[in-house]
Regions:
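Short coil/turn connectors at secondary-structure junctions
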Residues: 43-48, 83, 161-162, 188
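Short, compositionally biased "basic patch" segments
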Residues: 1, 39-47, 116-127
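Alpha-helix-loop-beta-strand connector modules within alpha/beta enzyme cores
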Residues: 37-53, 106-107, 111-112
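Alpha-helical scaffold segments that flank or form the walls of functional sites
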Residues: 1-44, 72-83
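Structural motif
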Residues: 25-26, 51, 90, 113
């Protein structure tokens, strides 16, 4: 973790130098990851919104069979949420509809990465016959992240059922994942 702590601190310093006063972090690593981020942030003048994540990802078969989150992981979620601002889901393709509905009961911030890549968008349709954004709505998210490959219909649903979409054009450009249709998003 020493290298990770070093790079996390370096990132926080870089954000401050560039004028960032608040950031939202989709923190991997479960409770340990959240506590590590809190340690890094102690004594820094930046505001953070930490969205934790448990290390549990369902297989295609579990998603098709609509398997719930096991109780042992529910207990991890409870502990996680005592130490962070909400839940940050990596995507609907790692979760069954049932588990997304379980996450929707969380009373803190709920957010999810969605339609980030063309591959993830198509994978959702292949596994469930539903688009990734449509399935993500089962979470009742406060916001969606990316929506790079969302259809007009997906954007319409998101505009009615979330507070908004967080776009990441700089990350998308550096990863060559495409550019979201921000103009269309603004028109919704």
């Amino acid at each position: 973790p020493k290298k990770l702590i070093h790079f996390m601190r370096k990132t926080v310093k870089s954000m401050l130098k560039k004028g960032t006063t608040t950031f939202v972090d989709f923190r991997e690593g479960g409770l340990d990851g959240v506590l590590l981020m809190q340690k890094v942030l102690s004594n820094t003048p930046i505001r953070s919104i930490i969205l934790g994540r448990i290390e549990y990802y369902q297989s295609k078969d579990q998603i098709r069979r609509n398997i719930p989150i096991p109780q042992s992981y529910q207990n991890q979620i409870d502990q996680l949420l005592k130490n962070c601002d909400g839940i940050g889901i990596s995507g609907s393709n790692e979760n069954s509809d049932f588990s997304l509905k379980q996450f929707s009961k969380i009373k803190k911030i709920r957010a999810i990465h969605c339609a980030e890549t063309k591959q993830s968008y198509l994978k959702s349709k292949q596994i469930t016959r539903k688009t990734e954004p449509k399935r993500s709505m089962l979470l009742k998210p406060d916001f969606l992240v990316h929506m790079t490959y969302a259809s007009k219909s997906d954007l319409s649903i998101a505009s009615k059922k979330t507070r908004g979409i967080v776009v990441c054009p700089r990350a998308n450009a550096s990863l060559a994942e495409g550019i979201p249709n921000v103009v269309q998003m603004m028109e919704m």
